[in-house]
Amino acid sequence: MDQFASVFGKAGSLIRLDCRSLEYQYFPFHPEGYRLVLMDSVVKHELASSAYNKRRQSCEAAVAAIQKKHPHVEFLRDCTMAMLEEAKADISAEDYMRAEYVIEEIQRVLDVCEALEKDDYE
């Protein structure tokens, strides 16, 4: 995503990238009166040896449970919280929490994009 932003970024805009289709959309970003702070935590991440694989397995397990009632679902991005709630009995507590986090984060991005289109920074 960093490389994508470096190549396709443009002044006064943020990019929303769909990593499945590589479609992208620009959203206006003119935060007059606000400051944006970016930080480097200097933490190195090794996906192969991190908890990434476990989190991915949790998400895949949640999708498998959701697919029992919603066979069109391929990924958590295709799910709603209502779908996840329907499958809760078939998902471990840890997998449920991880899936819930992903679905909420996807919705947060959509909400931010909608707010950016309205120049709503509150």
Predicted region positions:
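C-terminal nucleotide
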Residues: 8-122
